[in-house]
């Protein structure tokens, strides 16, 4: 697995340039941290890399495939936990997971017993509505949803927000 990000550009209107040539490469097994001041475009870059925001220019290739030309690349290769909670608040944790597990071919019930949901402590909260969960539990559930399709690439925006330090250090 190899990711090539080249000259990503994004602006809002004519005067607000958010990204002006972001570039990097990443190989399988590498961790990349995007660091910068508030408002410098970190979240914008991550949203573009996850396929939820369109870039004005540049290229993103995953294993040589142009992700901007084929939106299915994002679905196949990338799991994304955005900064803002992506969960369906009025549904239970279980129903949120079911939504993300559909069409994956994976056994959600087996994962609940010994997979990521069990490791992150989500399994005991499955029947609670998301709007009744703590911020930390919502973040854990969001991570489980992003990992439902077992993507080779996981993008986390503000990964430690709402999580206690011990859980933040667990390597999945």
Task: Name each region found by the language model.
Residues 1-5, 9-28, 33, 71:
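A short, flexible loop at the N-terminus of ABC-type nucleotide-binding domains that lies
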Residues 35-37:
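The feature captures the beta-strand-to-loop junction immediately N-terminal to the Walker
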Residues 50:
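Helix-to-loop junction immediately C-terminal to a conserved catalytic motif
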Residues 58-69, 73-74:
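Conserved ABC transporter NBD signature motif
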Residues 98, 108-125:
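Conserved ABC ATPase "signature" region
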Residues 154-158:
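Catalytic Walker B motif of ABC-type/P-loop ATPase nucleotide-binding domains
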Residues 170-172:
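Conserved small/polar residues in nucleotide/adenosyl-binding loops
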């Amino acid at each position: 697995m190899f990711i090539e990000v080249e000259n990503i550009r994004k602006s809002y209107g004519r005067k607000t340039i958010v990204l002006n040539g972001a570039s990097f490469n990443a190989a399988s097994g590498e961790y990349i941290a995007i660091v910068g001041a508030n408002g410098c475009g970190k979240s914008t870059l991550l949203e573009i890399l996850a396929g939820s925001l369109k870039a004005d220019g540049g290229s993103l290739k995953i294993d040589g495939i142009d992700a901007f030309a084929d939106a299915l690349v994002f679905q196949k290769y990338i799991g994304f936990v955005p900064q803002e909670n992506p969960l369906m608040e009025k549904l239970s944790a279980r129903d949120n997971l079911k939504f993300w597990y559909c069409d994956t071919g994976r056994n959600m019930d087996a994962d609940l017993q010994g997979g990521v949901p069990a490791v992150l402590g989500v399994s005991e909260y499955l029947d609670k509505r998301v709007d009744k969960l703590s911020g930390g539990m919502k973040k854990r559930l969001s991570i489980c949803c992003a990992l439902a399709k077992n993507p080779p690439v996981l993008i986390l925006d503000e990964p430690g927000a709402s999580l206690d330090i011990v859980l933040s250090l667990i390597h999945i």
